[in-house]
Amino acid sequence: MKVVIVGGVAGGASAAARIRRLDEHAQIIMIERSGYVSYANCGLPYYVGGVIKEQAELTLQTSESFWDRFRIDVRVRQEVTAINPAEKTVTVHALDSGKVYTETYDKLLLAPGAKPTVPALSGVSSERVFTLRTVEDTLRIRRFVEEKKPKTAVLAGGGFIGLEMAENLAEMGVSATIVQRPKQLLAPLDADMASFVHAEIRRHGVTLRLGETVTGFRQDGDSVLTLLEGSEPLHSDMVLLAIGVTPDTHLAKEAGLRLGIRGSIAVNERMETSVPGIYAVGDAVEVTHFVTGQKALISLAGPANKQGRIAADNICGGNSRFHGSQGSSVLKLFGLTAASTGINEKAAQAAGIAYDKVVLFPASHAAYYPGAQSMAMKVLYEKESLRLLGVQIVGGEGVDKRIDVLATVIRAKMTALSLTELDLSYAPPYSSAKDPVNMAGFMIEDLESGKVRQFHWNDVEDLPCNGSATLLDVRTEWEYQRGHLDGFRNIPLDDLREHLDELDRGKPVYVNCQTGLRSYLACRLLTQYGFTCSHLSGGYSFYQVVTKEQQTARSAYPCGMEKL
């Protein structure tokens, strides 16, 4: 059997190695357009920033190491320019020599990945405007930074690459500005959870220009102007386009393969395309979202590697299946970790799923052990079935551990109530006896059993302030004096029993505390004394971060932009 693989990196390289493990006698040819067949593309921003010191550390395998270990014929700096499914051939252009030749195949695997989205704007070809996707891109940016020593940079786009580059540039002393049309960074997060990310970025000196549209670029001596719709241009020494990626599927389209959403390659669970004998994996293919069942584009290394393995199994006569991706991701940003899995509120609404949510602020480990850090945790679940839909966590240490546990719960199709039963490891330096994952389950259990009601940060402005309801803040007097919600009366939780006669049982009670715990306790107390009570999910802390970010964003917009 002769297998030709178009593209390396995650999907193609993992498939090549798997095919060899399954079939020692197969002829395997891997053709890669760049000069690097297998590299850590997720580490590229950290090489630019000097966190990863040596270029060699980015290289996972080379052409030589693939041959020595797997006897795989790797051809770098060669580009497949056409596929002929009827003849089972590909046309290859050797970029260095200019030679064009034809290669036959029995099985063909496409792993072309995705290319940076470069809008058709004036000035994008400037030598000071960069994209970051390959090792060559990284070397070009690193060389520019070392030689030109830029003081300012504009990043067009606020996805993973844009944020990681903003962090690395800021750590190098470069004044960075992120500009994008959406008013929120990190699309997998809901806007309220993204507020924590925005605040952290601003705290480290990165300027956010959200809700603004880039209309072009113009070279201005040793700087470049980023032109904005309705605003003054931004002057900087360099620009990085981090708008996103687009599936690189022109070969598949020209070969007559069926395409999916946004021009991606349509595949089945076996990673087979619409043409027999041709498989496809990685960022170029559409997948089924594990939670919604809808088609999606999820450009992540984990799914690409799994798809490569599955395609290899089936190329070698197996029957492996890819059952979809839930988009689990994690990001380091200065002192913060942001992670998500499954779907957010916007996606749940788009899919027509009736859901509820809880917000909590647990500590990373036992609070009495030094170094505990808080995290903001948002858990979505389906109302009818109680299945877990998605989780977002932003905080310090321990975020990655919890998101992986909850990603496993989603994959296992367990209910939100099952979180209460998870038997998780505990020692004071690592967790609490009631782990944050368990705590989320306890909160959902109380909600669903009717033991507590809740309202959310965006409900606060609609609360009745005409005396028809009791608005109660159960924090300490000191906390209350430092800041509180308008119209809320302060009765500390520990004093509440002594003040029950001052409250009208005929009025609904809305309770607030710092993070939601004491308000929950107050509601349980009040309910048992005949009051109808709801508490603020996430408490004053959550409300304050979200509303403060909204105010900061509004003040940053040019006049009228806040309405766009």
Model-inferred region functions:
Residues H25-Q27, R69, R75-D96, E103, ...:
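A Rossmann-like FAD-binding core segment of flavoenzymes
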Residues L417-P428, S432-A469, E477-Y510, Q514-L564:
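Rhodanese-like catalytic fold shared by cysteine-dependent sulfurtransferases
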Residues M1, A284-E397, P428-S432, P436-D462, ...:
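Mid-to-C-terminal Rossmann-like scaffold of FAD/NAD(P)H-dependent oxidoreductases
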Residues L110-M172, T207, V267-E269, R489-L493, ...:
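Glycine-rich dinucleotide-binding loop and its adjacent helix/turn
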Residues S125-K149, G221, P233-I310, V405, ...:
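FAD-site-proximal beta/loop scaffold in flavoenzymes
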Residues V6, E103-G113, A156, L234-G244, ...:
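Short hydrophobic core segments
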Residues M1-R77, A166-L189, S328, K401, ...:
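Beta1-alpha1 glycine-rich phosphate/pyrophosphate-binding loop at the start
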Residues T59, T152-A153, F160-R218, I298-A304, ...:
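Rossmann-like dinucleotide-binding cores of NAD(P)H-dependent redox enzymes
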